[in-house]
Design a protein with these regions (language model features):
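Extracellular/surface recognition and adhesion modules
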Residues: 17, 27, 37, 61, ...
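Short, surface-exposed beta-strand-loop junctions and turns on beta-sheet-rich folds
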Residues: 24, 33-34, 100-104, 167-169
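Surface-exposed ligand/attachment interfaces on beta-rich extracellular proteins
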Residues: 56-60, 67-90, 99-123, 170-182
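Structured beta-strand segments within beta-sheet-rich domains
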Residues: 20, 140-178
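Terminal beta-strand-rich extracellular "head" domains
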Residues: 99-155
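Generic beta-strand structural signal
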Residues: 10, 37, 89, 152-154
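Self-maturation zones of extracellular/virion spikes and adhesins
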Residues: 1-34, 44-68, 73-77, 134, ...
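Short, structured beta-strand segments at or near domain termini in extracellular proteins/domains
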Residues: 180-194
Length: 194
């Protein structure tokens, strides 16, 4: 028969067996706490989650985070209002969404806006690049182009916007293409190294 004991941790002793109130429960292996169930019910793991028979660390889920990031222009002469974007990070996969809304704009600097995490450095056959459809108003799209798209390159901590068109090379959007009436909504999903 397999023996077991229900134990919990209190402020004076390491482990106790029996009834408990307002104390965390911990599961130990090799004398190390591996799983903690707090008195409010949330669970803390000391390592990561492995699905099925997965043993490779790269294939384990070890991170989940939700938060906000204050967007900032990489280049000068662009000031943003409503500059908070929301993000969710699950493992190395990040999804961000927000609005780009200038409050002051001048010059011909390229429009580049910070991200909460740097994209993965990826080249060769995998060539990780990420794009976003953009809902926009009051953006000056060059007459020879059709639309604009959001873009995150490899190993970059910012996103940018490109003009796209039929049988034309990409052309990066600049501050001159925006105004204080501009609004651009975006959502990106990209990989990071963290």
């Amino acid at each position: 028969a397999v023996g077991y004991a229900l134990q919990y941790k209190d402020s004076t002793t390491r482990m106790r067996q029996g009834t408990y109130t307002n104390h965390a429960m911990e599961l130990f292996t090799n004398d190390n706490a591996r799983i903690t169930i707090a008195n409010d019910g949330h669970v803390v793991l000391s390592n990561s989650i492995a699905f099925r028979n997965e043993t490779t660390a790269d294939n384990r889920l070890d991170d989940y985070e939700e938060g906000v990031h204050t967007q900032a222009p990489v280049n000068a002469n662009l000031t943003l209002t409503n500059n908070i974007l929301r993000y969710t990070k699950i493992g190395r996969l990040v999804t961000v969404s927000g609005i780009l809304k200038p409050s002051a704009v001048s010059s011909s600097n390229a429009v580049q806006i910070t991200l909460p995490f740097t994209s993965v450095a990826d080249s060769g056959n995998t060539c990780g690049r990420y794009t976003s459809a953009l809902m926009h108003k009051f953006v000056n799209i060059d007459d020879s182009y059709r639309n604009v798209v959001g873009y995150i390159g490899q190993n970059e901590a910012y996103w940018r916007i490109y003009h796209v068109g039929d049988n034309l090379d990409w052309h990066q959007l600049t501050n001159n293409d925006l105004s204080t009436n501009t609004e651009i909504f975006f959502t990106f999903t990209y990989h990071t190294t963290d």
